[in-house]
């Protein structure tokens, strides 16, 4: 069992671009958007993943992720009801942590940054490109985009 502890913020400027060490293209869809158990199919550059997530409890939830053959991921993505999400992810090291900045192109235009933490009470510094904390707000869950 794996627990995901993360915080999500809105982006207020493009300072993340100069600070990033890499960027990646991501396409993802949801076989299940049930809040108790989301099932996501993701193509991350040229690799496929299947992820099952439990219900959000603030900043903590169960997460199980498995690499799958890219051809399987493409076929599963075709089974996902619309919308399929298209985004670019920037990897940004800051303050001893790795921030993931997602720039969504489809189905909505949006920019968010996430940080995964070892514990809910972990103290961390905010990078200069983040604004409002939207952790736990269902409007910003990837599984709810475009609905």
Task: Give the predicted meaning of each segment.
Residues 1-147:
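Phosphate-end processing signature that detects enzymes handling 5′-triphosphorylated RNA
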